[in-house]
A protein has these predicted regions:
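N-terminal signal peptide
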Residues: 2, 8-22
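Aspartic protease catalytic domain
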Residues: 14, 49, 123-130, 180, ...
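Short beta-strand-centered segments at strand-helix junctions
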Residues: 57-60, 92, 137-157, 247-251, ...
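Extracytoplasmic, non-cytosolic globular domains
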Residues: 237-279
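Short hydrophobic beta-strand that contains or immediately precedes a catalytic carboxylate
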Residues: 38-40, 45-50, 56-58, 141-142, ...
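Signature of the N-terminal lobe/flap region of pepsin-like aspartyl proteases
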Residues: 29-122, 126-130, 135, 260, ...
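Aspartyl protease catalytic domain
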Residues: 16-30, 110-232, 316-327
Length: 428
């Protein structure tokens, strides 16, 4: 009897901590966009880990392929949550053209052609969305946002946690495993970097509050370079987005890569393609030099290294697509996709409202980075003091100017009065 109980306890703990396997699936012809498929029992969900999303999405995977329009619940969501079973509340959905209609109940989605999707033990608050920028493809994303457009109490992760529909608000991405709930025991050491939820004015209102880490320096080239060889790119921010199989870099840093990489190690073998003032992509003729080139991203003094060989994809014509894009929007926002997510473990901790990164190395340049941070803080403090002093000087100058003007007015007024008295004619 006791042995049976111990076995049951062991199995319960194993099931509770068992990672949910996920696979990567190419979803368009360009083979640049990926989705993660999570299997929970007999159910399968497509999700996108998006650290800037302020809305948490749970997608539909059963939408028929001949549905050409997709719904975005953020435009139509008017009801309160959770659903009231007694009132049989529903959320009605319709796309912009009215071609597809549907409704969401507490545990059921109906979308087009009378199709009904049962969602056992899950709260369903969104369906596939429509991306107009990069072709028309269906994809769903589970956004690990902190706030929503409707207030903190409407956060799907928090709501699901309170209703035990999702066990925890902690997600761990570790190569091809996604953990829900407790952080894996082997991550009992301190994370190499962590960042709190921040408010970035670089993002739209819908995505403004999210897990955004600070990126201060990059090193381009050989691994034996020191912190002195790094390039200061602060204040830059990083988001993590599993839907993209590339690293997105703001256009403002294009010249840095041009001078340190493409006019140096890769001179003459790459061409640049600009797409409608939206982005710049890079195609190269050969990749023999890539294995000796590294990009080192310094976050909180820790270095996260990606070999340029891991940022390439061979095209059908034999040329090499470099998985780096320069985006014209968001001047300071970098986005790290699968090339980074595959190499490092990322913990999105909704209970502490932080993101933790594991696997970064700091021994080579953490001390120098710390000195740089102190130097920057000292310079900022000196700038604040200088601004304060200049402000005081300006205020004092304006004060004395006003006083001088008032004195001058008074003297001028006395002179006028004296002149009037002196020139006054005697009364007859």
């Amino acid at each position: 009897m006791w042995k049976f109980l111990w076995i049951m306890i062991f199995m319960c703990n194993y099931i509770k901590n068992k990672p949910i396997e996920y696979i990567l699936k190419e979803i368009n012809d360009d083979k640049e966009f990926y989705t993660i498929i999570i299997k929970l029992g007999n159910q399968s969900f497509e999700v996108q880990i998006d650290t800037t999303s302020s809305i948490s999405w749970v997608p539909s995977t059963a939408a028929k392929s001949n549905i050409t329009s997709y719904l975005n619940i953020s435009n139509y969501y008017k009801s309160k949550i959770p659903f009231d079973k007694q009132k049989n509340e529903t959320i009605l959905l319709v796309d912009e053209d009215g071609d597809v209609q549907g409704e969401i109940r507490e545990d059921t989605l109906s979308i087009g052609y009378n199709e009904e999707i049962k969602l056992n033990n899950f709260i369903f608050l969104a369906v596939t969305f429509y991306d107009k920028l990069f072709k028309d493809y269906p994809n769903g994303k589970l956004g690990l946002g902190y706030k929503t457009l409707y207030g903190n109490n409407s956060n799907i992760l928090k709501l699901s946690y309170n209703q035990t529909k999702i066990n925890k608000t902690i997600f761990t991405l570790e190569q091809n495993k996604l953990y829900f709930g407790e952080i894996p025991e082997k991550l009992n050491n301190y994370p190499s970097s962590s960042c709190n939820i921040t408010d970035s004015n670089e993002l739209d209102d819908e995505y403004r509050n999210g897990w955004i880490c600070s990126l201060t320096h990059i090193i381009i080239g050989k691994l034996d370079q020191t912190f002195e060889d790094s390039i200061d790119i602060s204040p830059s921010k990083i988001t993590f987005d599993s839907a993209f199989n590339y690293i997105s870099i703001p256009k403002k840093f294009y010249d840095i890569f041009l001078n340190h990489l493409f006019n140096n190690e890769l001179k003459g073998i790459c061409t640049f393609n600009e797409f409608e003032n939206i982005e710049i992509t890079i195609i190269c003729n050969k990749s023999s030099k890539f294995q000796d080139i590294y990009l080192t991203f310094i976050i909180d003094g820790f270095g996260y290294v990606i070999n340029l060989n891991d940022l390439t994809k061979k095209l059908d014509n034999g040329k090499i697509l470099l998985l780096i894009k320069f985006k014209f929007e968001n001047d300071n926002i970098w986005s790290f996709g699968l090339p980074f997510i595959k190499l490092y473990t990322i913990v999105f901790n909704g209970e502490k409202n932080i993101v933790e990164l594991y696997g970064g190395e700091r021994e080579d340049f953490f001390e120098e980075w710390d000195k740089w941070r102190e130097h920057v803080s000292s310079n900022q403090e000196n700038e604040r003091r200088m601004l304060f002093i200049v402000g005081c000087i300006v205020v004092c100058f304006m004060f004395f100017l006003v006083v001088f003007f008032e004195i001058w007015k008074c003297k001028n007024k006395k002179n006028v009065n004296a002149s009037l008295i002196f020139n006054e004619e005697p009364i007859q």
